[in-house]
Amino acid sequence: MQNQQIRIRLKAFDHRLIDQSTQEIVETAKRTGAQVRGPIPLPTRKERYTVLISPHVNKDARDQYEIRTHKRVLDIVQPTDKTVDALMKLDLAAGVEVQISLG
């Protein structure tokens, strides 16, 4: 896999899960002899929802909810075949979305 790069994008609602997953990926890649750039934290997306808790009137009675989506990017430069095999066998947490692209 000469002159290739693997870009891994991670998304999760819990920042502890995403940090743990990135740490596992970095350790696995370094153990197999690849060079790792990152993890690079991307901006956190905050979605806010406002809900009326009153059944009829009284617009002052509201609840506000927020969902935060944390994102990280990792670049693995010049991966070996052992690196790709190790990353495929890696078991990450259930709440983390992983996108892998070759470039």
From Swiss-Prot:
Record field: transmembrane: none
GO terms for cellular component: ribonucleoprotein complex; ribosome
Database matches in Pfam families: Ribosomal_S10
Gene Ontology MF terms in the entry: structural constituent of ribosome; tRNA binding
InterPro entries named among the record's database cross-references: Ribosomal_uS10 (IPR001848), Ribosomal_uS10_CS (IPR018268), Ribosomal_uS10_dom (IPR027486), Ribosomal_uS10_dom_sf (IPR036838)
UniProtKB keywords: Ribonucleoprotein, Ribosomal protein
GO biological process: translation
Role this protein plays: Involved in the binding of tRNA to the ribosomes.
Subunit structure, as described in the record: Part of the 30S ribosomal subunit.
UniProt family annotation: Belongs to the universal ribosomal protein uS10 family.
Name recorded for this polypeptide: Small ribosomal subunit protein uS10
Provenance organism: Ectopseudomonas mendocina (strain ymp) (Pseudomonas mendocina)
Gene label: rpsJ
